[in-house]
């Protein structure tokens, strides 16, 4: 495997390095199957075995992943994350429009015992808070800026699904269907000789 498989580096200095992780790549080894390729495996193979990931993103989520180059830097940055002194912003395209243009979703979530690796809203779970703002509306879809105030596994996806706005193409908490131009553009006409392809589809 060549270093070309490493995601693009968007920032680096003597203490940290930030990668633009693509959708479909784990950040760290999977608990169920540690052999699945992940970002830290690539970083350790091609850059340094001493780097640490400061946080994680879901496999299906693309975005910036920050890595510390030393243990003291990791401890310092981890403290900032734990103290909620780091602002995290996600952009989500949903199927369904929130009832309000902005708000805070407060729902307790916990692991789903019937579906290993997945989460669910449950009154006995841990309290989670997700703030959102509608950036733009597309008929029955919405583009949201999302700010998780807490950091539970799959929190954003579970919370958005809970208010009837699952993330497009989310097969775990939504219908898994892609987004088609015909769903957004009025009077859209598709060539009869060609099937319509999704603008955004499943991995």
Task: Tell where the protein language model's regions lie, with residue ranges.
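RNA pseudouridine synthases
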Residues: 1-139, 143, 160-161, 180
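Short alpha-helix boundary/capping motifs
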Residues: 33, 150-151
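Active-site lining segments that contact anionic ligands and/or coordinate catalytic metals
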Residues: 141, 153, 200-203
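Conserved active-site beta-strand-loop modules that form the wall/rim of enzyme catalytic pockets
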Residues: 142-144, 154, 165
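Polynucleotide-recognition surfaces of large bacterial nucleic-acid defense/processing enzymes
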Residues: 147
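Short beta-strand segments enriched for Tyr within beta-sheet-rich domains
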Residues: 152-160
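Phosphate/ribose-recognition catalytic cores of enzymes acting on nucleotide-derived substrates
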Residues: 161-203
